């Protein structure tokens, strides 16, 4: 089943590998997070922003650096950047500009990247972490955000080992990014993990970005220093495990240099899977030649823009989690966190709760358990990609209500869910049609005496063929009766409630004692 468990870090441990901060070498760490924006078009052209298409199929003249082509700012990218900035409590700047960062690399055909070095779109934000929601050991921790800036993504460089060629794909060139730069406020890995997870959840919730590390939609750089010394940047870390390993490696590298009386040089390093490796000196050097971009106008925003965007924002994740663990939902915290990280499931839950609890008056625990344990669990059990549209909330709600009204056994209901998950073609059938198709309806048109006789016949048959289980039950292992009940439910295709079989088995087994 999809796991809802969290890693629990001890107060001194920084990551699962046992990385501890040496009190003699105080760690200071900041993050630079590059986030691809979910826009239809690229940042400065009308090419599609889908960079996973066939190589070089979504490339305009501007994207490939053709001389004479001019940029035109995509307003959707600006809006998504502003949404993120406001949600992160940032000061949106009424005046911002674009600058050119010059460097030569094959995946940057213009010879420069358009970014916002001098006047970014937002400054001075923050994100609050707390021990209740964010798996940190401290009661609370504020991570300050220095700035948020809009910039272009680069193309992709791929080495073809068969053709022995370096191939350039410019589909990703000029895809809009925001770069978030934090202050060096992180003191351990648990804080870093918590911040990244919370940020991922936020941008997904706002529909600003897919939030995926694996696909490169979010890419992270570490800035690491010890005892207030020079800052070293570690580039392009694509997972939490890489972050933890790279931080541990760089922290110990700087400690070793300090112990041997060597200076820690301000530079950019990469991660090769085992250690950080030098790439280049830091960008404070003059070779980047930052200059204002003369082809793009200044961005002048109305001072009221922040309030207007804030008013249009949906409830943010922490507020929703607080609502979900309170009346009337009363979800467990781990389930609330899971729902907030999966917006489609959250909306599904709201609809299901309305149908089962508000409209039908059933217990809230029933709706919670059937969605989390039975429906989502069925997808995991049968290794089917999670697609809750196969079983709309109206259909699951009907199943839950029938079980609650004793019109359908729990076993039959689970069987129906399993079939809906495994057989997408059944999606169009009604619940009654599904019950008839799989013959899982409760036994009808039978007297109580006839039902009792049929149940006893099944139980007697099962007992006769499972004497070893009976021996376990009578010698002090009463839970073994569940095995017999399971056999009986299977024998009757789930048409009789399990408690009926349980009572009959206990009655018959009592004669053995």
Curated annotation (Swiss-Prot):
Give a yes or no for keyword Nucleotide-binding in this entry: yes
Which GO terms of type biological process are on file?
glutaminyl-tRNAGln biosynthesis via transamidation; mitochondrial translation
Subcellular location, in the record's words?
Mitochondrion
Q: Which GO terms describe its cellular component?
A: glutamyl-tRNA(Gln) amidotransferase complex; mitochondrion
Which enzyme class?
Answer: ligase
Similarity comment text for this entry: Belongs to the GatB/GatE family. GatB subfamily.
Q: Which PANTHER family match?
A: GLUTAMYL-TRNA GLN AMIDOTRANSFERASE SUBUNIT B MITOCHONDRIAL AND PROKARYOTIC PET112-RELATED, GLUTAMYL-TRNA(GLN) AMIDOTRANSFERASE SUBUNIT B, MITOCHONDRIAL
Q: What does this protein do?
A: Allows the formation of correctly charged Gln-tRNA(Gln) through the transamidation of misacylated Glu-tRNA(Gln) in the mitochondria. The reaction takes place in the presence of glutamine and ATP through an activated gamma-phospho-Glu-tRNA(Gln).
**NCBIfam families (UniProt xref):** gatB, PRK05477.1-2
What's the further remark here?
This protein may be expected to contain an N-terminal transit peptide but none has been predicted.
Identification of the protein by name: Glutamyl-tRNA(Gln) amidotransferase subunit B, mitochondrial
């Amino acid at each position: 089943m999809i796991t809802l468990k969290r890693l629990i870090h001890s107060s001194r441990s920084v990551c699962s590998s046992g990385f501890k901060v040496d009190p003699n070498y105080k760690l200071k760490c900041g993050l630079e997070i590059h986030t691809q924006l979910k826009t239809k078009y690229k940042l400065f052209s009308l090419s599609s922003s889908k960079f996973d298409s066939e190589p070089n199929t979504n490339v305009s003249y501007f994207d490939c650096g053709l001389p004479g082509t001019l940029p035109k700012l995509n307003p959707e990218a600006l809006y998504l950047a502003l949404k993120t900035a406001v949600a992160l409590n940032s000061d949106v700047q009424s005046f911002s500009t674009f600058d050119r960062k010059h460097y030569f690399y094959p995946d940057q055909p213009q010879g420069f990247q358009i970014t916002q070095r001098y006047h970014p779109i937002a400054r001075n934000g923050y994100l609050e972490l707390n021990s209740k929601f964010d798996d940190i050991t401290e009661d609370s921790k504020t991570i300050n955000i220095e700035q948020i800036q809009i910039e272009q993504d680069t193309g992709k460089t791929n080495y073809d080992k068969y053709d022995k060629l370096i191939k350039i794909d410019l589909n990703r060139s000029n895809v809009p990014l925001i770069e978030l730069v934090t202050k060096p406020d992180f003191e351990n890995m648990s804080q870093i993990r918590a911040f990244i997870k919370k940020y991922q959840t936020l941008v997904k919730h706002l529909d600003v970005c897919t939030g995926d590390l694996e696909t490169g939609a979010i890419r992270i750089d570490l800035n690491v220093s010890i005892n207030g010394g020079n800052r070293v940047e570690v580039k392009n870390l694509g997972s939490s495990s890489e972050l933890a390993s790279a931080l541990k490696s760089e922290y110990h590298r700087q400690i070793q240099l300090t112990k041997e009386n060597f200076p820690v040089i301000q530079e950019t390093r990469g991660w090769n899977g085992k250690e950080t490796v030098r790439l280049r000196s830091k960008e404070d050097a003059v070779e980047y030649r930052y200059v204002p971009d003369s082809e793009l106008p200044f961005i002048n925003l109305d001072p009221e823009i922040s309030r207007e965007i804030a008013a249009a924002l949906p409830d943010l994740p922490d507020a929703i989690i607080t609502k979900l663990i309170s009346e009337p939902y009363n979800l467990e915290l781990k389930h609330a966190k899971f729902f907030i990280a999966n917006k489609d499931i959250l909306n599904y839950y709201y609809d299901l709760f309305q149908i089962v609890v508000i409209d039908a008056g059933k217990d809230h625990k029933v709706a919670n358990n059937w969605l989390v344990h039975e429906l989502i669990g069925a997808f995991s059990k049968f290794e089917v990609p999670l697609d809750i549209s196969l079983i709309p909330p109206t259909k699951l709600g009907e199943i839950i209500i029938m079980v609650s009204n004793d019109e359908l056994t729990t076993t039959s209901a689970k069987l129906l869910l399993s079939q809906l998950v495994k057989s997408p073609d059944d999606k169009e059938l009604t619940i009654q049609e599904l019950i008839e198709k799989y013959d899982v309806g409760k036994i009808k048109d039978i007297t109580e005496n006839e039902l009792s006789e049929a149940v006893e016949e099944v139980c007697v048959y099962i007992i006769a063929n499972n004497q070893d289980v009976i021996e376990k039950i009578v010698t002090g292992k009463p839970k073994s009766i569940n095995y017999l009940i399971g056999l009986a439910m299977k024998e009757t295709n789930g048409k009789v409630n399990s408690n009926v079989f349980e009572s009959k088995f206990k009655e018959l087994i009592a004669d053995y004692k």
